[in-house]
Regions:
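Acidic, Ser/Thr/Pro-rich intrinsically disordered cytosolic tails and loops
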Residues: 1-222
Length: 222
């Protein structure tokens, strides 16, 4: 019995050591990955053009995978800006007087025509449903629609991420099938990532985004 108990203790100790080693390795890998991404970001030059040849799904994939942007919903905003510049959506500013005579500005989006790219068509379809019969998307309407139909937006975001990964892989962006580390990227893949990071650096350093009107989206044009 004593020998059996000792054996169980030894086995338990070995298993515990193994678990600790695996946890330490995982933490070390995450830290190394984040350090490599941070170093790559710091070395990226400013980029003022539309990244990745205008393929927003690739930009979305790179931004999400390499910690350039944490909010998936940023893709929705970028697509809406793109459709505004193409004349598919017309932003209309309204000013109303609220309580105590305080004026309030709001921006409504008038849906004009269907866009030409697949991902924009998918979002435009969602916007049409959210806007209702008048074809004008008012503040909070998209938010309310997404709350009632969460799959409509989540599916669009997931499909965009998957498509972006597939397109990036087809364009020889990875050294292998896929990856989440800088070392998993080819020279071409690193160039594509540098464009996304460079645009973010430019916008953060030189653009007061919070002060821009929606009509000032010319920077997103080709």
């Amino acid at each position: 019995d004593d020998e059996g108990g000792l054996l169980e203790t030894i086995i338990g100790f070995v298993v515990l050591i193994g678990i600790v080693v695996v946890v330490v390795w995982l933490i070390s890998s995450v830290v190394k990955r984040k350090k490599a991404i941070k170093a790559f970001y710091e070395q990226a030059n400013y980029y003022r053009e539309v990244p990745n040849g205008g393929e927003i799904r690739v930009s979305h994939f790179l931004a999400q995978t390499f910690d350039v942007a944490n909010e998936e919903s940023l893709l929705i905003g970028a697509l809406i800006l793109s459709m505004i510049n193409k004349g598919c959506i017309d932003p209309q500013t309204e000013e109303s007087v609220g309580a105590f005579g305080k004026s309030k500005k709001s921006v409504n989006l008038k849906l004009i025509k269907k866009p030409d790219t697949d991902i924009e068509k998918k979002l435009y379809k969602v916007l049409v449903k959210a806007a209702g019969e008048d074809g004008i998307l008012q503040e909070k309407e998209l938010e309310k629609y997404a709350y009632k139909h969460p799959e409509s937006v989540s599916n669009l975001l997931e499909n965009a991420l998957d498509d972006g990964r597939e397109i990036f892989a087809e364009n020889k962006g990875f050294t292998g099938h896929s990856g989440r580390k800088i070392s998993d990227l080819t020279a071409k893949g690193k160039e594509e990532l540098a464009e996304v990071m460079g645009l973010k650096k430019y916008l953060e350093d030189f653009s007061l985004i919070s002060e821009r009107e929606i009509s000032e989206t010319i920077i997103w044009q080709d």
